[in-house]
A protein has these predicted regions:
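Conserved SAM-binding motif I beta-strand of class I
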Residues: 104-109
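Conserved SAM-binding loop of SAM-dependent methyltransferases across substrates and taxa
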Residues: 90-102
Length: 238
């Protein structure tokens, strides 16, 4: 039942290069194996180039993406849905949703180099005609897509470099009346509850974990750092 799937979501904290859909399993062991299989597939994708400090291009690692997407699928199910991946990077989230049974996946990215990487990764997806890329900057206005979006997923900029950089991502999805929005954000973010309420959404925290930050930029003094993040779910109330 849908309510039971949601409760499970909120309470739960192969050598062939051709990518196939990953079948759902009804038991815990099957879910663990499914997540591991997904993590291997996502980790094998060509990585995000991560060149822009301004765009806060921190890549979502395959293991984290797999854990998060599996939790989303447990509660909201990607099966047969149109999924929008906003600020798609190398396509790890959108392609992950495709593995989990999405009917259509639209990936929006403003970085031309990143779009090229997504296109290379899409080639590895079997029957990839249901995956689409849009080269466009997210600016708070509606993005034209071929059919109604059922679920949006994103790892938006958190506003480290530019204050409120995440707002246009939320405004875009709100303008499109997306019923379910799943996103990653810094655990220190304090504006999310009020943002959700003022736009007619309920905010749920799915779980929290560490987000690894590779030394991709010159201002990083350490080889690798990490920050604490939360994975959230927004549900439209009307």
């Amino acid at each position: 039942k849908p309510c039971n799937r949601l409760n499970m979501l909120l309470e739960c904290n192969n050598s062939n290069n051709s990518i196939n859909r990953i079948s759902a399993s009804s038991n815990d062991v099957g879910e663990v194996m499914r997540q591991r299989h997904l993590a291997m597939r996502l980790s094998s994708l060509k990585p995000h180039p991560c060149h822009s400090v301004e765009l806060e291009q921190y890549p979502t690692e395959g293991n984290l993406a797999a854990a998060w997407l599996t939790k989303i699928d447990l509660g909201d199910s990607f099966e047969g849905k149109h999924v929008l991946d906003l600020g798609a990077g190398n396509g790890v989230l959108g392609i992950g949703a495709a593995f989990l049974g999405a009917r259509r996946v639209t990936m929006v990215e403003c970085d031309r180099t990143a779009i090229d990487v997504i296109e290379e990764n899409i080639v590895e997806v079997e029957g990839n005609e249901f995956l689409e890329t849009i080269h466009q900057r997210v600016d708070g206005t509606t993005i034209e897509v071929e059919s109604k979006v059922d679920i949006a997923i994103m790892n938006p900029p958190w506003g480290v470099q530019t204050k409120h950089a995440d707002r246009v991502f939320f405004e875009t999805l709100f303008s499109m009346n997306v019923p379910l929005i799943h996103f990653i954000h810094s655990i220190e973010a304090e504006h999310l509850a009020s943002l959700a309420k003022s736009n007619g959404y309920a905010l749920h925290s799915i779980y929290q974990t560490d987000f690894r930050l590779p030394a991709a930029y010159s201002h990083h003094k350490q080889q690798q750092g990490s920050t604490r993040i939360r994975c959230y779910r927004l549900e439209r109330l009307n």
